[in-house]
Amino acid sequence: MCTKNQAIGILEEVYIACSSILKEYIKDVYLYGSYARGDYSKESDVDILVTAALDRSELSKFRYALASISSDLSLKHSVTVSLTVKPYDDFMLYSSALPFYSNVIKEGIRYGA
C-alpha cells in the first residue's frame, strides 16, 4: 500500500517512462480509481491510464515495453501498478458514452493538470 501522494509520484514516473517509449505520441496520463478518489485500502492497486496518438495496432508494438514499466514500478513501490494504454482518439470518442472513460475524466487526476 502507498499513500495518495506516493500514487501521484508513481503517476509522474509512469509519464516519464512512457514518454521515453511513446515519445511525442503521448497525450494524457491519468491516475484513476481508488487512489484518485481517496478511498484506497491496503488491497488497492494504482490504476493509471495513458492515452497516445496512435491506433491500436501501432500501440500493440509497444505492449511488452509498457508491461515492463508496470512490473518495474510495482516491484519498486511494493504496490500493484495497473497500467492501461489506449488510443487517444478512442478515448475521446467514447469518453461521453462509456462509463470507464467518463469516470477517468470525472474522478481521475490528470498528470500536469
Where does each model-flagged region fall?
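Short beta-strand->loop micro-motif that forms the acidic, two-metal-ion catalytic signature
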Residues: 46-51
